[in-house]
């Protein structure tokens, strides 16, 4: 192609806008020129050099123009070359398009020719298939017999021979597969079923591994070898792999679980301990069999002992979860399961046995019982035990109450004290339950301990209520007890026995105040028994104190002697109460007698007619105080616990001859007995019968002006328990503040 044609093919270049670089350069040049010119005009001495500047700028402008022309010429030449290359590429593309069109035409002609050769190709393929079949025909004829023989081998559990025969048949099928173009002959249709039958037979043998290891280990070895060989061989393309190793392992696990946990029936109520005991014996034997007999029949990668241990653990855990999801267990079953799962299972009797290797360790697996399971079982055990303990304690109490109406008194121990096995039975029941709970866990022990203390408190309240009913029925005549007081005294010994032995219920490390509610209930029981005994004593003495004080009392000691005799008879069995309770009881009895004595004095039945009677009354008080003190000393009351000397203090009020000194005596009485009131003092002063109203008022005023009682003063409650007389006799002054008011009014 000549240059003229080339020029014709080149497109005409239309003039474009000016270059932005040129415009920017021109602006910069003008700016620089203006700057220089402004400097020249500001400095006239530089005008002489204006010509030089002009010539220099002309030269610079010419140089720039020549450079611009050179750049433009180079740019235009490059554009011209690019246009020429583009034209060349267009020519090449047009030539390629024509060549492709010719090739398409040739291909269409060849496809038509191939269609005419298709029947020939099919004939060739059929010829090849027939040729291959003609070579394999002797072997194919033997396939049905081989299939039948293989089935016989499988039925006879000759796994290795059956597997070899199946592999030969499978290889023959593969040999016919390629020549037949993937077509499977009908003679091989039962081959997959034979493989599945062999797999099931191997699986069944693995499921009975424990039994086969003892009876026919060669059969187990053959089954495992077949599974390993089949798993390790390369699977032909398009065939699903037969992972017989996994099937074998699953069969080992399923067979083991079926042997020990396959029964869907859960142990019946009460049969759980026997079931757990059977597992305690069977599981270690199973692990020992696995280690000694099954493991040598299997490859090392099977980890037979670990597989056995984990399978037994998971099966047992699943069975226990199913058991707990069913009906609520009884107390014995809940305890047996807790103790077995927390102590026996991981102990040296079972999974923690030193005879088992580290492969049998299951301590890192999920525990047999979750925390929720343990909480559920502990709550069930405590609830059932609480019901049983409550019933046992109630039975013990009912048996004790039934004896209170007997014709003979309470039983005694060798020392002569009243005795009953009930306290020992109660504490033994509670202590034994706490001890049994400690065999399981500390948390269960604490739960049972709290339950035991609660039930003991309930028992003590029931015991107290039973005593109240016993007393009420006795005094109302519904059920007269021949030995009412002795059985109350026996109840005091029961309380003492419980108090002295309740410390056995204290847990090691428990807070010191854990037994405080029980001790408070025991103290309340003791106070109630005291009150019942003293009420009986008061009922005995009340008719005698109705004649005290009186003229007969002044002249004869027989009245108080009768009181002492009856009190002595009433208290004759107090010695059968154990110390220190007997001392407290005697002190309370003496105080009850003294209180009745004081109450009788306060009734105002007697007013002395003269100094002789006052002296006689004072002497009677001294004699009565000595007689009461001697009575309770003979009964065994310690001397420092007596309160009968209060009568000696009252004696001084009657024996004092100078009424002006009564204020000092009243103040001294207040010092010794801070709970004495104006009403009491007024009633006692009324016994004298010789006081004027002014003297009476002065004595009462000294009571108010008395110094506070000394710290050593007796703090025993006496006068506050004595009711002040409601009405004073005519010969006596009115009592209390009313008395002072009336005295002032008169």
Swiss-Prot record:
Disulfide bonds: none annotated. PANTHER family: EXOCYST COMPLEX COMPONENT 3-LIKE PROTEIN, EXOCYST COMPLEX COMPONENT SEC6-RELATED. Residues 1-23 are annotated as: Disordered. Residues 1-370 are annotated as: Mediates interaction with EXOC2, EXOC4 and EXOC5. This is Exocyst complex component 3-like protein. Interacts with EXOC2, EXOC4 and EXOC5; may be part of the exocyst. The gene is EXOC3L1. GO terms for cellular component: exocyst; secretory granule; transport vesicle. As part of the exocyst, may play a role in regulated exocytosis of insulin granules. Signal peptide: none annotated. It comes from the Eukaryota. Keywords: Cytoplasmic vesicle, Exocytosis. It comes from Homo sapiens. It is found in: Cytoplasmic vesicle, Secretory vesicle. GO terms for biological process: exocyst localization; exocytosis; peptide hormone secretion. GO terms for molecular function: SNARE binding. Its main location: cytoplasm. Belongs to the SEC6 family.
